[in-house]
């Protein structure tokens, strides 16, 4: 099984009143096709690591590779495309856009890649049906239960056929 994400000496610090080092020289290889679980007490760096893996944040030091390509944090356009194409993210909070329906929340994530609204809508409807929401696709987040919102988030994370899902 090949490495998909490789972390080498990743550290992350936050500066508030004092320098808080959350991750210290983390080295790990994530393989394709495997399932990983992050566990630890509150404040131990789980969310920080997920934000680094999803390219939402950058490490204070260290090297991260996706495939064989080292992440260049100055190239935000490339990183945005990588995130959209290869990474599905299911947030702890649903992060749905409140002014858009369940269907729109899912297909908007695909539209930047697909460039065809009709195809994006068809894919989105299929995914929403798979997660049991075919009768709720035109409902807004405020009209959905917490579990339904989470299922919309799952469909949104899956819409671009990612190689990795971070949750």
What spans do the regions from the language model cover?
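Conserved ABC transporter NBD signature motif
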Residues: 62-73
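Helix-to-loop junction immediately C-terminal to a conserved catalytic motif
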Residues: 54
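ABC ATPase NBD coupling module
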Residues: 71-88
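Short coil-to-helix segment of the ABC ATPase nucleotide-binding domain corresponding to the Q-loop/switch region
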Residues: 100-109
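Conserved signature/switch motifs of ABC ATPase nucleotide-binding domains
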Residues: 84, 139, 160-161
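The feature captures the beta-strand-to-loop junction immediately N-terminal to the Walker
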Residues: 39-41
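Conserved ABC ATPase signature
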Residues: 140-144, 148-149
């Amino acid at each position: 099984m090949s490495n998909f994400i490789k972390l080498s000496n990743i550290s992350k610090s936050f500066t508030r009143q004092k320098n808080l080092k959350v991750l210290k020289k983390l080295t790990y290889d994530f393989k394709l096709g495997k399932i990983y679980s992050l566990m630890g007490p509150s404040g131990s760096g789980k969310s920080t690591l997920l934000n680094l893996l999803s390219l939402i944040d950058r490490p204070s030091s260290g090297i991260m590779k996706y495939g064989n390509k080292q992440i260049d944090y100055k190239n935000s356009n490339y990183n945005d495309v990588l995130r959209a194409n290869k990474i599905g993210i299911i947030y702890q909070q649903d992060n749905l856009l409140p002014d858009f329906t369940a269907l729109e929340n899912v297909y908007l994530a695909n539209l930047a890649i697909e460039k065809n609204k009709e195809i994006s809508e068809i894919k989105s409807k299929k995914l929403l049906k798979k997660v049991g929401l075919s009768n709720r696709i035109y409902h807004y987040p405020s009209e959905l239960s917490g579990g339904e919102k989470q299922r919309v988030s799952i469909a949104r994370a899956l819409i671009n056929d990612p190689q990795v899902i971070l949750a």
